[in-house]
């Protein structure tokens, strides 16, 4: 069984204060295969305080320094891409080749792009008679879902690293393993202590503590609308910035006279991508009543 016994706070691997662990089950085999720590609010507080201490020096680092570290992280992640694909394959129950191509290589490429954009933080511009200067927000709390575990981490942590923000990450309790590898890599390349922190556990236990923490400046969450509402409420007390990607509906419209067979085949293929678990996945088809029967028949076959 794969075991991660500690969480990553202030550049160190430390035990969760709860002393408790959760077991991960491979959806494809329905067998337990890994265990990870279950953090408590006290761990969240320690992680946020570490991020706050690190913010000053990190926000004053140069874009070139941040890009160099991001490039080093990309290189190490690439070296461990097979390992990452294996971990994600097991925790999501998906084929290894799909995990490596979509869930690993894509996010690494994305992180490299964020590194290349670090210099934009140092650019000033005049707009309508005003001087616009970019500044890092501060301490960011990131809560990510299970369907694209590493991608969602990179999409949130990557811009934070590039812009000079520090972060505390709480990944989905179902798919946290790639996040441990990410934390290991951050330590290996010499990312300053406290710039990136990892706490794992149930959202019902530590989600509110993270979203409402007075030292957190921004909360970013991807997941259900119901949970998003609770996070917004928790963050409102501190008037934090809140950035959320919640549930959605994505219709596919087949115009009258269109090639129904071609359109429906595309819809069926697209809606099954990643087992249909995407926030922008096609979820319904709107077709003219004159072509309804044809559309249903194509979808069936």
Descriptions of predicted regions:
Residues 165, 170-172, 200, 222, ...:
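Short beta->alpha connector loops at strand-helix junctions that form conserved
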Residues 30, 66, 88, 111, ...:
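Residue-level signal for inorganic ion chemistry
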Residues 121-194, 217, 239, 261:
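Conserved small-residue-rich beta-alpha loop and adjacent elements
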Residues 49, 71-82, 96-120:
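Long amphipathic alpha-helix in the N-terminal Rossmann-like dinucleotide-binding domain
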Residues 120-127, 200-201, 266-267:
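Short gly/ser/thr-rich secondary-structure transition/capping motifs
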Residues 129-130, 198-217:
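A structured beta-alpha segment of the ubiquitous adenosine-cofactor-binding alpha/beta core
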Residues 226-301:
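ALDH superfamily catalytic-core signature
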Residues 1-90, 261:
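Short, structured beta/alpha segment
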């Amino acid at each position: 069984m794969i075991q991660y016994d500690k969480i990553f706070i202030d550049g160190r691997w430390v035990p969760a204060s709860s002393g408790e662990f959760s077991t991960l089950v491979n959806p494809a085999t329905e067998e337990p295969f890994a265990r990870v720590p279950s953090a408590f609010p006290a761990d969240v507080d320690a992680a946020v305080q570490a991020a706050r201490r690190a913010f000053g020096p990190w926000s004053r680092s140069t874009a070139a320094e941040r890009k160099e570290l991001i490039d080093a992280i990309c290189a190490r992640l690439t070296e461990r891409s097979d390992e990452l694909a294996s971990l994600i394959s097991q925790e999501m129950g998906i084929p290894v080749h799909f995990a490596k191509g979509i869930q690993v290589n894509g996010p690494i490429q994305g992180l490299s792009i964020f590194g290349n954009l670090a210099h934009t933080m140092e650019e000033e511009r005049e707009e309508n008679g005003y001087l616009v200067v970019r500044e890092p927000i501060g301490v960011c709390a990131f809560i990510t879902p299970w369907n694209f575990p590493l991608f969602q981490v990179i999409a949130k942590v990557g811009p934070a690293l590039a812009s000079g923000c520090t972060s505390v990450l709480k990944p989905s309790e179902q798919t946290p393993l790639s996040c441990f590898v990410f934390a290991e890599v951050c330590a290996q390349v010499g990312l300053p202590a406290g710039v990136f922190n990892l706490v794992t556990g149930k959202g019902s236990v530590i989600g509110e503590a993270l979203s409402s923490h007075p030292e957190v400046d921004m909360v970013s969450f991807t997941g259900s609308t119901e949970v998003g509402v609770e996070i917004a409420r928790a963050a409102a007390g501190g008037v934090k910035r809140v950035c959320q990607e919640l549930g959605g509906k994505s219709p596919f419209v087949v115009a009258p006279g269109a090639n129904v067979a071609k359109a429906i085949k595309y819809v069926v293929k697209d809606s099954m991508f990643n087992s249909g678990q995407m926030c922008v996945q096609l979820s319904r088809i709107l077709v003219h009543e004159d072509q309804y029967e044809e559309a249903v028949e194509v979808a069936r076959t």
